[in-house]
């Protein structure tokens, strides 16, 4: 009975969080209302970023989903374990039913260290990341990567 009550409370809080996030990010945030987010999940849309979430996405504690000028698209039925982070400056596309182990970091960018400037002024190199359907990733995911279906 306690689990059922906890699930209902979490569902209501997730729904409210999605509504509030949508209000403050009208153009940059699109989500199905059927999600299961931990109370500590952070969603951030900066600059011209966009986050597109399909339904039935489940997150554990301390997950961060961030679009910093890029597009973060997450397919149906995805699972993010504790401490996962996805940050898009260009584009990250995650297929349906993808699962991520604890502390997986997904970035589509890296510091541009080829520049003669200091690391703080050098900017970023970006490349799209595509993760297919039915994929399980258990550790850090490097930018410029492409992972096909059922990997």
Predicted regions and their residues:
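A short acidic, helix-capping loop that chelates divalent metal ions and anchors anionic groups
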Residues: 115-117
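A short acidic, glycine-rich active-site loop
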Residues: 119-129
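Extracellular carbohydrate recognition
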Residues: 147
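Extracellular/periplasm-exposed beta-strand and loop segments of Gram-negative cell-envelope proteins
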Residues: 110-111
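Domain-scale signature associated with acetyltransferase and cell-envelope carbohydrate enzymes
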Residues: 1-107, 128-134, 140-143, 151
């Amino acid at each position: 009975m306690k689990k059922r009550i906890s699930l209902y409370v979490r569902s209501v809080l997730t729904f409210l969080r999605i509504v509030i996030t949508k209000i403050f990010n009208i153009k940059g945030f699109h989500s199905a209302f059927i999600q299961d987010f931990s109370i500590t999940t952070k969603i951030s849309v900066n600059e011209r970023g966009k986050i597109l979430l399909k339904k039935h996405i489940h997150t554990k504690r301390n997950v961060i989903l961030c679009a910093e000028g890029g597009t973060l698209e997450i397919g149906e039925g995805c699972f993010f374990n504790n401490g996962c982070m996805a940050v898009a400056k260009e584009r990250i596309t995650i297929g349906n039913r993808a699962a991520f182990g604890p502390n997986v970091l997904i970035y589509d960018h890296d510091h541009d260290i080829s520049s003669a400037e200091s690391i703080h002024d050098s900017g970023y190199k970006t490349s799209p990341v595509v993760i297919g359907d039915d994929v399980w990733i258990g550790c850090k995911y490097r930018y410029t990567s492409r992972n096909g279906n059922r990997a």
